[in-house]
Amino acid sequence: MRYWYLRLAVFLGALAVPAWWLYQAWIFALGPDPGKTLVDRLGLGALVLLLLTLAMTPLQKLSGWPGWIAVRRQLGLWCFTYVLLHLSAYCVFILGLDWGQLGIELSKRPYIIVGMLGFVCLFLLAITSNRFAMRKLGSRWKKLHRLVYLILGLGLLHMLWVVRADLEEWTLYAVVGASLMLLRLPSIARRLPRLRTRPGVS
């Protein structure tokens, strides 16, 4: 398998982060509300993984190195895993598995609805991220996977609604996300491979 070392590094890194958070929770190092801290960190981790997934194509075009594309799907699946853990942690630590409380939460915190929409879209991408689905869906596969752009927008909106007044960190992620979207505009995307082939550029 090509780039196995890169795939292994992504696997170990993505696995180590939540494992470390769980260890911190075990030793009471996550503050007075470790459950909420875990929910927040898993959500932020999912957003970071989504941005990394979207960064792979521009990086490949700029560098010409195919290794970036080799881990793109893996990063996307880890993003889904983090979202699933984020949702599970919310149900356990915030709701306390009290499903009757969910209706109240939805009415008081509509950002949860935004997050759920993003989860449903990401679920569709996760279950179709395989060769069988690509063959079965044909040209519709690419159209379906453009949902990733909607997912990014929903993720940023979800985070904005959660942080509210503390916009400094959110702005950073929003700028990175907007930049990655700009790099996908046809007029810009066509120029990326040329940047590495210009005289004087190594």
From Swiss-Prot:
GO cellular component terms, A-Z: plasma membrane
Principal subcellular localization: membrane
Cofactor: binding comment: Binds 1 FMN per subunit. Binds 1 heme b (iron(II)-protoporphyrin IX) group per subunit.
GO biological process, one term: protein repair
Essential cofactor(s): FMN; heme b
Segments traversing the membrane: 8-28, 42-62, 75-95, 110-130, 147-167, 169-189
Membrane topology: Multi-pass membrane protein
NCBIfam families in UniProt: PRK05419.1-2
PANTHER family: PROTEIN-METHIONINE-SULFOXIDE REDUCTASE HEME-BINDING SUBUNIT MSRQ
Family from the record: Belongs to the MsrQ family.
Protein name as catalogued: Protein-methionine-sulfoxide reductase heme-binding subunit MsrQ
Organism (species): Pseudomonas aeruginosa (strain UCBPP-PA14)
